[in-house]
Amino acid sequence: MNDEQRYKQGLEVRTEVLGEKHVNRSLENLNDFNQDFQNFISRFAWGEVWSRPGLPRHTRSLVTIAVLLALGREDELRMHLRACFNNGVTKDELKELILHCSLYAGLPASNAAMHMAEEVFKDLGIAPEKVNKD
C-alpha cells in the first residue's frame, strides 16, 4: 500500500471511529502549518496502526482511553471517550476501565476521567441515572 492509499484508508477509519463531524472540522482547519501533521495522523495513526488486524477496534478504544487517562492527556481523552461508542464500548465497560486504571494510573487521574466521562455522557444525552443514597 502506498502513502496515498494509506492516507485514504486512514481517513476512512478515522471517520468511522471519531465521526464525520470531527474529521471534517480537522480537514477544514488545514493550513500550511498543520497540514503535514494532520496527514501524518491520518496516514500513520489511522491508516497504519488503527487499521491493523491484531486487535478489534473495541479493544483499541479501551486501550487508548487507558493510556490517555494514565498520561493525563485530557483533550485526546475527551475525544476518545466520545468516540468509543462508535466502536461498541459500553458505559459499564468505561466505568470498569476507569476503576481499574485507578490502581495503576492513580486516583486523581481516574477521578478526572470519571468526571470527564460523565460530562461526555451528558453531552451525548446518555447521562447516568441518579441513585438513591440510602
From Swiss-Prot:
Pathway note: Aromatic compound metabolism; beta-ketoadipate pathway; 5-oxo-4,5-dihydro-2-furylacetate from 3-carboxy-cis,cis-muconate: step 2/2
Molecular function terms, GO-annotated: 4-carboxymuconolactone decarboxylase activity; peroxiredoxin activity
UniProt enzyme class: lyase
UniProt keywords, alphabetically: Aromatic hydrocarbons catabolism, Decarboxylase, Lyase
Catalysis: reaction(s): (R)-2-(carboxymethyl)-5-oxo-2,5-dihydro-2-furoate + H(+) = (4,5-dihydro-5-oxofuran-2-yl)-acetate + CO2
GO biological process terms on file: beta-ketoadipate pathway
Pfam families: CMD
Entry annotated with the keyword Lyase: yes
Entry keyword annotation includes Protein biosynthesis: no
Sequence similarity: Belongs to the carboxymuconolactone decarboxylase family.
InterPro entries xref list: 4CMD/NDH-1_regulator, AhpD-like, CMD-like, Decarb_PcaC
The enzyme's E.C. designation: 4.1.1.44
Protein name: 4-carboxymuconolactone decarboxylase
Organism of provenance: Acinetobacter baylyi (strain ATCC 33305 / BD413 / ADP1)
